[in-house]
From Swiss-Prot:
This is Thiazole synthase. Catalyzes the rearrangement of 1-deoxy-D-xylulose 5-phosphate (DXP) to produce the thiazole phosphate moiety of thiamine. Sulfur is provided by the thiocarboxylate moiety of the carrier protein ThiS. In vitro, sulfur can be provided by H(2)S. The lineage of its organism: Bacteria, Pseudomonadati, Pseudomonadota, Gammaproteobacteria, Lysobacterales. Homotetramer. Forms heterodimers with either ThiH or ThiS. One of its GO terms (biological process) is thiamine diphosphate biosynthetic process. 1-deoxy-D-xylulose 5-phosphate binds at G167, A193, G194, N215, T216. It comes from Xanthomonas axonopodis pv. citri (strain 306).
Length: 264
């Protein structure tokens, strides 16, 4: 589930992770495909929609824990489908009970069914309650830099701005807002929602995001297992490119070969 601290670890709530790709568990055709895609992604943190996925609520139905055991993965229960702070807090408390006191949670409070944009007022309210209740909150939010900082100040352990609407596959729509969030953050910034393909994930990492969470981009692909593998490589490549430092953009050419010793 967690590993000894490598030189470039993703650190969330004091735990070190080698993988910067977080994956969802919804929309797959069955639990076996969920397992195979998660393995291909090399994900260590997997999100679980408590309202939609069985992790023990129904002892007579197949459980996600059968294929993604907590001993191997960090399960990140989320509040998908919640539209009020009260509902989100109630869902988090249920998850903590089902997972034997597990405090790490992903908070999302939606504004409407059409856009699935976060309701920022309800999100702030829920975040304050959950942090006060001892939860380690990773929070889905808009790409508003002021709001992102406010959620960090409340005590959220990671801030997760959207790249585009959930499930849209549009990719990053406002990289300048993301850069502003990243540059001012003291907690991990993880892009959540809107990624469509590997290049989207790579761009997020090149900008300096600490990780990317995705579900539809993998589960909705023609070959989810292959896409999971592609996303893993994109995350790794984007992170390495960020650490390496890209060359500056210039208007005019710059010769790659030296002029010293040119004949003539």
């Amino acid at each position: 589930m967690t590993n000894p601290a490598p030189s470039d670890a993703l650190v969330i709530a004091g735990k070190h992770y080698r993988s910067r790709l977080l994956t969802g568990t919804g929309k797959f055709k069955d639990l076996d495909e969920t397992r195979l895609a998660t393995e291909a992604a090399a994900a260590e943190i997997v999100t679980v929609a408590i309202r939609r996925v069985n992790i023990g609520q129904d002892p007579n139905a197949p459980s996600l824990l059968d294929v993604l055991p907590p001993e191997r993965y960090t399960l990140l229960p989320n509040t998908a489908g919640c539209y009020t702070a009260e509902d989100a807090v109630r869902t988090c408390r249920l998850a903590r009970e089902l997972l034997d006191g597990h405090n790490l949670t992903k908070l999302e409070v939606l504004g409407d069914e059409k856009t699935l944009y976060p309701d920022v007022v309800q999100t702030l309210k829920a975040a304050e309650q959950l942090v006060a209740d001892g939860f380690e909150v990773m929070v889905y939010t808009s790409d508003d830099p002021i709001l992102a900082k406010r959620l960090e100040d409340i005590g959220c352990v990671a801030v997760m701005p959207l790249a585009a609407p959930i499930g849209s596959g549009l990719g990053i729509q406002n990289k300048y807002n993301l850069l502003e969030i990243i540059e001012n953050a003291k907690v991990p910034i993880i892009v959540d929602a809107g990624v469509g393909t590997a290049s989207d994930a790579a761009i997020a990492m090149e900008l300096g995001c600490d990780g990317v969470l995705m579900n539809t981009a993998i589960a909705g692909a023609r070959d989810p297992i292959l896409m999971a593998s592609a996303m893993r490589k994109a995350i790794e490549a984007g992170r390495e490119a960020f650490l390496a430092g890209r060359i500056p953009r210039k208007r005019y050419a710059s010769a790659s070969s030296p002029v010293d010793g040119v004949i003539g």
